[in-house]
């Protein structure tokens, strides 16, 4: 193989490899997007750290201890409701919605402890 053919092969290989990696980078919600019927909740910003997978078939669910008042980022594949019952506070989340830093400043990720499928009107707060 001559030098010209070697260079053409090398450049072609590099271009193919680059085209495979364009459009999706670590932490992109497009790369970690939850499929329909699921929500991915992360313990760190930018869709990093531990991940909790919620399926809408679970119904109203209290988050695992490590995620209560600690939802740092999320991506939703379904319409769901994030909630806190004491004091009562709810946020409706649409399918396809995501947030890279949900617990920053006054964001609700620092206060939520429940997740509900569908509309927030379905919330039933547990009695204390």
Curated annotation (Swiss-Prot):
The keyword ATP-binding does not apply. It comes from the Eukaryota. One of its GO terms (cellular component) is extracellular region. Coiled coil: none annotated. Its main location: secreted. Glycans are attached at residues 55, 119. Residues 1-26 form the signal peptide. It is found in: Secreted. Keywords: Glycoprotein, Secreted, Signal. Belongs to the Dictyostelium gerABC family. This is Spore germination protein 1/2/3-related protein. It comes from Dictyostelium discoideum. The lineage of its organism: Eukaryota, Amoebozoa, Evosea, Eumycetozoa, Dictyostelia.
């Amino acid at each position: 193989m001559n030098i010209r053919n070697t260079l053409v092969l090398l450049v072609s290989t590099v271009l193919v490899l680059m085209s495979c990696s364009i459009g999706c980078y670590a932490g992109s919600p497009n790369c970690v997007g939850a499929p329909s019927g699921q929500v991915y909740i992360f313990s760190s910003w930018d869709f990093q750290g531990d991940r909790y997978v919620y399926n809408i078939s679970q119904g109203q669910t209290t988050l695992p201890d490590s995620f209560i008042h600690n939802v740092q980022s999320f991506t939703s594949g379904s319409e769901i409701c994030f909630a806190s019952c004491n004091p009562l506070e709810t946020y409706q989340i649409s399918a396809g919605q995501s947030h890279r830093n949900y617990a920053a400043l006054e964001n609700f990720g620092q206060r939520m402890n429940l997740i509900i499928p569908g509309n927030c009107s379905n919330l039933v707060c547990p009695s204390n």
